[in-house]
Amino acid sequence: MALELGWGGYWAWDPVENASLIPWLISTAALHTLIVQERRNKLHRVNVALMCLTTISAFFATYLVRSGVVQSVHAFGDGSVGTPLTVFVLGGLLISFWAAFAVPARGRELAGIVSREGFLVMVCWLLLALSVIILVGTMWPVISLLWTPEPHGLDANFYNRVCVPLGMLIMLLLMVCPWLRWDGGLRDAPRFWLALGAFVASGAAFFFLGYRQPVALLA
């Protein structure tokens, strides 16, 4: 089954474009956890693993484009490079696990969830969850061959139903994060509640004026 890009929209979850999105999501997660490492001296192993995964996912994107394992209007090349890239990606994963566990554990334990570092870690996990969902969805034509002779792909509706809510949750967490202290609690509670009230009021006003798309209202 060929999953093709719809040229009438700005994003239609084409497999090759999905492959380029995955490294971006992982590297974005790494940037946020690196902030925790710089400010709080924590998550050293996590950051090593995320930086390694960013590089590996970039080569995996090359594998999708050049191997032809998943059909796309953006893919090119034949399958001759598939095996070397597969070996490289699997070898890179093994090296990444070794490198992550070779880093000595140091620093204090993470603060509670309702803290700046807690929210940044949640953002990291959500970004990684998005990466896994998009990876599985992109490779679904190959995975489906385990139980059916004909490959079956997932259309854009699947990604929109699953990824858009997670993306909105990430946006909400990042909106609240600057108002939190590193050790927990609000930095300036009166201003936070004032800003939250203004946000809810403006969102309600736009909603009644006819702007009904949740992502646009959240932005």
Q: Over which residues does each language-model region extend?
A:
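C-terminal TM-helix exit segments that contain a strictly Trp-centered aromatic cap at the helix terminus
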Residues: 1, 57-65, 132-141
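Short, motif-level signal for alpha-helix interfacial/capping segments enriched in acidic residues
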Residues: 1-4, 43-45, 115-118
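Interfacial helix-loop-helix junctions of multi-pass membrane proteins
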Residues: 1-18, 67-75
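Structural motif corresponding to the C-terminal cap of alpha-helices
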Residues: 3, 32, 36-39, 180-183
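Glycine-centered flexibility sites
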Residues: 8-9, 61, 68, 137, ...
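Contiguous transmembrane helix-bundle modules in multi-pass membrane proteins
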Residues: 15-22, 51-53, 71-219
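Transmembrane alpha-helix detector for multi-pass membrane proteins
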Residues: 20-35, 52, 62-64, 68, ...
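Phosphate/diphosphate-binding loops
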Residues: 29-30, 35-58, 89-96
